Amino acid sequence: MRTGAGVAATFILSLGGAVATGSEPASAPAAPAYQDRLIATGDLAALPNEQDTADVDTSGLPRGWRVEAGVADTHYGSLDGHEAGLAIDGFWDTLSWGSWSIDALLHSGNSGDGGNGSSVTIWQRQMPFADGWSADNGLGVVNAPLLPLMRSGYRFTLPTSVMAGIETDWRQQDGIEIQGAFGEPGFYQGSHWADFHATGGQLAQVGVQMPWSSSTSSSIAAIGEHDVVPWWLASGQQVTATGAIPRVDAQSLYAATAWQGEDTQLQANLLAGSMSGGSTRTGLWLDAQTVGERYQQHYGAFRLEPDLSWGVLPFTSDIEGGYYRVDFQRAQWIWSAGVDEVRSISGTGVDGSYFNGAARYQARPWLAFGADATLKPGSDSAYSGDLFVDWKTRWGSSRLQYQQAQDSASRQSRQITWDQSLPTRENVHVSVSASFAAVDSAYGGTTRSASLATYGSYQLGDTVSLDGNVRWTHGDGPEGQHGFDGNLGLNWRFARAWTLSANYYESHASQRSPFVIDPISQSTPFVTLPTSWAYSLLIRYEFRAGSPAAVPGGNASGAGALAGSVFLDANGDGRRDAAETGAANITVILDGRYSVRTDASGRFDFSQIAAGEHRLKILPDNLPLPWQLDEKAANVVVVVKPRSDVRVDIAAKRSL
């Protein structure tokens, strides 16, 4: 349908054509007919809600607060937990002292969820100094920092300690970096609020990274811990015969040198440490990378002695060997292959050769298929593999996948899965998944199971959003289980600055999948988890102010919202499918200045940010093993348009 202006323009042009016809020869060509050029309704972003822009204080630099209060109840097996919490997050920019933020929590709960506690963390980021120096400082509950070379390992990555204390990270634009941390170590506990629990003792860590030239850099770091609880007793569940929790002292040293050539990168690493006067344990590993026009090769060697650790935190140990991997990409083909040779130094750990390979062929813009496999030959042979086909239609993106695995106990598993991501409008995501699995045991017959799952997020107008996933499982046979688990979150913004959130989770007889063969650990059978449920009810108040337009991160170009999740990508396709779960308590930093943590379902959001390009940095410190983030997933660039809601799902993948 034409607009009034379009109709008027057509009438005027028609009249002009008629007048011209009367004065020109009859043979003159007729003027081309006018065509309206209308903006499609679906391409025009909605105007901002007047309620959102009213009474905004635009004086001063960007600043804001978020206050969240609520209650939560949990049940896990035979344990019941009751929680109440008050969380306060805030940020404010300064001209000369960098960007500041605060993260405070007042938590009350019974013994099943860690008891009562409180914590406050203050961050100062990008504080400028002369000669190209800047600093990030943290006071409160922080993770001890790791130097870039400590995080860049392809095969092995050092763990990081969480503590109540202080940390500082100084960087110079020429590549020099100096870090330090001191505090009391501890651990996170709680279902909805990740409350910190100190375990006593002291931890000190220092490190420095120095570039020697444009192609060479080195780093050295040391950690010392005194009178601390060992990592295997960190939860306080195990005690000595006298009822006292044993404590230890630990010291570790890390050193690395990296060389970067035109197409080759080489990094040598040394880790040495001891615990409570024991003998020094040493680890050496070498990582190399060669990048060609269409291929990328990773190769290395390692020798990691038994009981190797970084402080009291465990590191991969009791193995020696090497690995080689190659990734190739050309036109429609992507394939990779790798081999690991692993031997136990003590003779009591894992031994063997491991082979893996994967291939994907993009047959059409809308069609691709591929396969991958992992094989461990020998007396304790095992394998896993899958075939898949991906296609896109008007019904969205689809994947059909067949998986098969067998361990050394002649336990064979087979599973066929269909994943479907449905086409939706902006701010809506819906995916469904269906699978059928069978497990054959040499001693217990065959167990069959079927499952159906769905995951979605939906924006109901301007004030209500819904996010959740549901999975149903039915099985029969010796290990058959009837299972159900669901997670549903509802957010209602009932006033300009106020939001009410309700979340519910329930799980019955859920199982972990066995379709993984890892060179460093044994394969895992189906493991039934205890019945659990949880609910939470929260009310949130948010305040934004400052110039420009009360949004952090940009100029007065309008504002939008950014939300998303960090999830465990079980099938490695980079897309969050219905049966894949979120990663909780992961720090997400916006533009190096403003940070949030993912909730129990892996969700995060920045409710109002400047339009334009932004960078997200995801810190993998609290990811569960064996999951990790590659360089691309840990550093994400997103573009936010005015009045738009952008969603990004960040995939953590199993370590190779």
Regions inferred by a protein language model and the residue ranges of each:
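Outer-membrane beta-barrel channel domains
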Residues: 31-392, 397-409, 416, 535, ...
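Predominantly the C-terminal beta-signal and adjacent terminal strand-loop region
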Residues: 481, 485-556
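A short, amphipathic beta-strand motif
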Residues: 562-568
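Acidic carboxylate motifs that coordinate Ca2+ or other divalent cations, activating on Asp/Glu
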Residues: 573
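Short, acidic Ser/Thr/Gly-rich low-complexity loop/linker segments typical of extracellular
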Residues: 582, 592-603
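Hydrophobic core positions of the immunoglobulin-like beta-sandwich fold
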Residues: 596, 606-607, 650
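Short Pro-Gly-centered beta-turn/loop motif in secreted/extracellular proteins
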Residues: 605-615, 621-622
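Structured interaction patches on ligand/partner-binding surfaces of diverse proteins
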Residues: 621-648, 652
